[in-house]
Regions:
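Surface-exposed, polar/charged interaction patches used for macromolecular assembly or partner binding
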Residues: 1-360
Length: 360
């Protein structure tokens, strides 16, 4: 069983007080006081005398008080609370994408107005939808990536099951096969619509009128439907270490968003663990390239002659794991989560391991 030190290491140059500014994130704030931002819950002392004591707002004055505890003196609190990660850098992954365990049984588009091949805002889609009601709001989505657990110790290339041009935001992701179980199906939103007429005796399809679509995507037959969520995400969370239930789970990077096949700070990644494994928003992982197993090719010479040293091909050597970065989860699904790379020393690639943030 792995054990990690939990002693809180306060930054030597930390401020005695800090006035929270608009644009700060909880990771930024924690880093001003701590060498390890994921230990913020260890020093944060919520004020029980104020509403929503765990939220921090621009204008609040944070102080490192007695026994290395951070307390907050509320400011005017006229703006939105500070978020865990910058909204602008993760917004497409909050509003456009979701992951489901299966796409079987989802309602779907069977046809379009005037027998079109594509439909956009203001036009009509005909959908197979049980128990449809006029006025219901639905998101039209398209399956893009099918996630599966990567092979161990493998740097994977940008292959995978994807519908080209369908809203997939990843530049590299793991390609599943029949030997590795599917973790989930990613759905990209292509439009929104409202049910105006339901199926009846003379028709088997309900009518969905599409909203004006600012993203320019077009709906087509075969697209699926999911309910519109009133609040699909929450960005008010603290960085923290993984729950005990995550220990021992083989968590790996499934996808990266950088322009090539690797991601650096402020790039989004997908990892192979979610709510079912105890991962929640704010969970921090360290990301590692597993040490390669290389052939031990050199034979030590039995004499001083250099040409006696030859490649033997015998034996293999395991190289050390290599640290790449830290990432913080900002959205979770059953078996997949999205995380933002917060800091690192080298690019993150698909297949890298996600470990406890204090792993060495």
């Amino acid at each position: 069983v792995a054990a990690y030190a939990t002693a809180v290491e306060v930054n030597g140059g930390h401020p005695d007080t800090y006035v929270v500014r608009k644009g700060d994130t909880l990771w930024d704030i924690a880093g001003k006081f701590l060498q390890k931002p994921w230990l913020w819950p260890e020093i944060w002392q919520a004020n029980p005398q104020i509403a929503n004591p765990h939220l921090i707002y621009p204008g609040d004055v944070l102080s490192l008080a007695y026994l290395d505890r951070v307390t907050a003196k509320p400011g005017p609190r006229q703006e939105a609370p500070v978020t865990g990660v910058p909204l602008a850098q993760v917004e497409p992954f909050l509003k456009q994408l979701s992951v489901v365990d299966s796409i079987e049984g989802l309602p779907y588009v069977v046809g379009l107005e005037d027998n079109r091949l594509r439909a956009t805002g203001g036009q009509t889609a005909y959908v197979r939808l049980a128990d449809a009601q006029p006025g219901q709001r639905w998101a039209v989505v398209r399956p893009t990536v099918r996630y599966a657990q990567p092979k161990p110790t493998e740097d994977l290339t940008a292959n995978g099951d994807v519908t080209p041009g369908s809203g997939n935001l990843w530049k590299a992701f793991n390609a599943p096969n029949h030997r590795r179980g599917v973790l989930g199906y990613e759905l990209a939103q292509v439009g929104l619509g409202t049910i105006t007429q339901v199926a009846g005796e003379k028709t088997e399809a309900s009518t969905l009128v599409l909203d004006s679509n600012a993203n320019g995507r077009e709906v087509r037959a075969g697209d699926r439907l999911v309910p519109v969520e009133a609040q699909p995400y929450d960005l008010q969370f603290f960085p923290h270490v993984p729950a005990a239930s995550v220990e021992g789970v083989d968590v790996r990077v499934l996808a990266v968003t950088d322009m090539f096949d690797a991601g650096g700070p402020r790039d989004v990644i997908a990892i192979s663990a979610g709510k079912a494994q105890g991962v929640d928003n704010g969970t921090v992982f360290s990301l590692w390239r597993q040490g390669s197993h290389v052939a031990h090719r050199m034979k030590y010479p039995t004499s001083s002659r250099m040409d006696d040293s030859r490649s033997t091909g015998a034996g293999r050597v395991t190289l050390p794991d290599e640290y790449a970065a830290h990432a913080m989860v900002f959205r979770t699904f059953d078996n997949v989560s999205y995380a933002l790379v917060m800091q690192g020393v080298k690019p993150v690639k698909v297949g890298y391991s996600a470990l406890h943030p204090d792993a060495k």
